[in-house]
Amino acid sequence: MPAPTRQQLLLVDDEEDANEELAELLEGEGFCCFTAPSVKVALKLLTEHPDIALVITDLRMPEESGISLIKRLREHTSRQHLPVIVTSGHADMEDVSDLLRLQVLDLFRKPIYHVRLLETLNNLFPEPKVYQVGN
């Protein structure tokens, strides 16, 4: 019997290799991942997939930043409480201050420490228990 699929996650990063690597890791843990190379694509995916339960976004991207995405989410009534995790290779104190104000769940420095990320996700979304009926 296949394991039930866990929550839908949206991964936003202009580095598509990073998105694919993270998606592979998280799908191996049972999550369903959508990837977006930009804020524009991320917003489109959020509209198309209302069951997305969490966003993991890079902080710095060429067209629009992760902070811009989070601000848009917080202004959108149906998505204002959507949990967001931010990743960054170089966040400064001003970024951290903005992220705290925007009620970000966590900030991970790149390269992402996968064990800690999985702990965070498993605490937020406990793995479904699969019960096997005995004979």
Where do the language-model regions lie?
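Active-site beta3 strand of CheY-like receiver
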Residues: 50-56
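Charged docking surfaces used in two-component/phosphorelay signaling
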Residues: 20-28
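Short amphipathic alpha-helix used as the core "switch/output" element in two-component signaling
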Residues: 44, 67-80
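Acidic catalytic/metal-coordinating carboxylates
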Residues: 37-41, 65-68
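The feature encodes the CheY-like receiver
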Residues: 19, 61-63, 92
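Alpha4 helix (beta4-alpha4-beta5 surface) of REC/receiver domains from two-component response regulators
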Residues: 68, 80, 91-107, 119
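C-terminal output helix
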Residues: 112-121
